[in-house]
Amino acid sequence: MNGDLNRLMARLGYQFQDLSLLELALTHRSVSRHRNYERLEFLGDAQLGQIISVALFEQFPEAAEGQLTRMRASLVRGQTLALVARELGLGEYLVLGGGELKSGGFRRDSILADALESIIGAMLLDGGEPRCREVVLAWFAPRLDAISPQSAQKDAKTRLQEWLQARKFELPTYEVTQVEGLAPKQTFDVQCSLDNVQQIFIAQGASRRKAEQEAASLALEWLEQQYD
């Protein structure tokens, strides 16, 4: 296990002094109701918001409060955190119960996002605020460099459409692939298809509109990484 954790710490860019904190940060509730990452997630969520808030405040001295709020929301939302977690390869190190493991929980956006926040909480306790901030800012550096008050004002579907039109690509298509539950507690799975690049992006939301926005955001982030 320690060898695996050493590889993970290399990916994170942080060396834990207390490995039990890292192990706890990787343990899902499906393994243990009492010893899991939820408390660390609570701490990491607050710390991440503070780190990103300060970074945006310093990076955009002329931005209004509303613009800062929208940029922060874009950076700390679940889909973005899940992408960062995938870039770090976090999913393969998660400790899941049998049911979650069989259902592919290590690929689920919500679990990946929660685990990333729990890692942040664990780093805060293990190494203190300055070191935690340094590591988190390194993870988010490409997104902080790319974001602007103007881009944060437009929703993801609009920004994706503008990006595609500017390059004379075909516009995306959206399709609901699954609806779970009963109203008003339904969840919608939507896929966004980009024919030009032969890619499909799938997201889930509490409404069709929210799911489409999340799928569009995933598509746009992938395109910007591949082409810009």
UniProtKB/Swiss-Prot annotation:
Q: Can you say where in the cell this protein is located?
A: Cytoplasm
Cofactor(s) needed, names only, are: Mg(2+)
Q: Where is the active site?
A: D45, E117
Q: Which UniProt keywords apply?
A: Cytoplasm, Endonuclease, Hydrolase, Magnesium, Metal-binding, mRNA processing, Nuclease, RNA-binding, rRNA processing, rRNA-binding, tRNA processing
Catalyzes what? Endonucleolytic cleavage to 5'-phosphomonoester
Q: Which SUPFAM superfamilies match?
A: dsRNA-binding domain-like, RNase III domain-like
The name of this protein is Ribonuclease 3
